[in-house]
Amino acid sequence: MQVSHSFASQSAVFDDDHLVSCAGLVPVMTLAQQTGLTGLLSEKVQIVAPRIKSGAANPSPKLATLIAGMCAGADCIDDIDLVRSGGMTTLFDGVYAPSTVGTLLREFTFGHARQLESVLRDHLVALCGRVDLLPDAAKGSVFIDIDSLLRPVYGRAKQGASYGHTKIAGKQILRKGLSPLATTISTAGSAPVIAGMRLRAGKTASAKGAGRMVAQAIRTARAAGASGQILVRGDSAYGNRAVVRSCLRAGARFSLVMIRNPAVERALAAIDESAWTPVSYPGAVQDPDTGAWISDAEVAEIPYTAFASTPDRITARLIVRRVKDARFPDALFPVWRYHPFFTNTDLPADQADITHRQHAIIETVFADLIDGPLAHIPSGRFGANSAWILCAAIAHNLLRAAGVLAGENHGRARGSTLRRKIVNIPARLRPAEWCTSRT
């Protein structure tokens, strides 16, 4: 492919106020208006004692401007200017400059972030009432997943930035950053939506605040129409008393990885060798005659009492998956890696294992956010960054709802695909009665 034009330094001038590059923002922000987003922002976000009085004025349209920019692909404060370019101000009223939005974000404190988090939850409920975001939630199973990620930062002035553990290429490393904690809601036939998100310092323990986050996510799922069984899934950081207690109080079931402490090790040793059953796993094949799996992975279960020395002791199922360690292919006897998780579901052990492994779906949400608004943590102020990630979560849910309305495969598409196919559509503005000739 060859370029068929030659350009001089003055040949490209973008001065047409009748052109827009993000025409798809019109239906997306119309959906936001139909679900009461601006009203929720006006009602719940109140900055009573601002440092800069003008900076805290009109938070609703300023935050709506930020959310619209994120839906169009903004990943830093300056990128919000794209909703003011060309003819965008003709399509939307109350569009604010990036500097004005940044001033508002820097007014946010911990309490204001909690206000914005309540907007996220209530708007998700409103979206579920307008769009079938969680199909079969009333009858089938609903899954709540909880996990955290570490977003790297590099500036010395970043409030809350500290060294925390993260895994890269399967190896645990220390990395400087900030650590959002997120909960998502999904069903078997839907992509996950974000029920809650909270920014924390990089060195914060993964489980801090997890019990409260899970309780809020369960309430949000119920309000969004999940009247069936709810299953809460998490990795070993969340296999603790607080999370289990929140699940039991709310009538939800749990499937949580357990840390291999001495009590768990004793339970593993007590499993009889004949109890292990091969299961579906990458590389496994199924016997065409018997239907049995020929696999390097096996599961078994045993009753287990967790938190036995506390008032929250509970007896349920300890399901263990063991996988042959690929580092020792020529060992005389198989060398196994064990992965135990604690659950009170009534699924068969092999199905419970598959359902538990589907907890990894939350990583698709993190991938969407990192490929969009969370490509950067833009501000030096912790409160501003807390507001930023919550607006990113609202934008994620809004795009997900727009994808469901668009139909076909858009309901489960990546965020970048939704922006490319739905939002970032160039268009020309013209009078409604403008005559055109057709030949």
Name each region found by the language model:
Residues 31, 65-66, 80, 97, ...:
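Short, conserved catalytic/metal-binding motifs centered on acidic residues
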Residues 31, 80, 349-387, 391-400:
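Short amphipathic alpha-helical "interface-anchor" segments enriched in bulky aromatics
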Residues 395-439:
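A short, flexible helix-boundary coil/loop motif
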Residues 169-176, 249-264:
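Acidic, His- and aromatic-enriched active-site or binding-groove loops in soluble protein domains
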Residues 223-230, 249-251:
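Short, surface-exposed connector motifs at secondary-structure boundaries
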Residues 87-90, 151-153, 204, 237-242, ...:
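Flexible loop/turn segments at secondary-structure boundaries
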Residues 1-14, 255-368:
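An anionic, glycine-rich sequence signature occurring as long contiguous blocks
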Residues 1-205, 210-224, 247, 272, ...:
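Dynamic "connector" segments at or just before major functional cores
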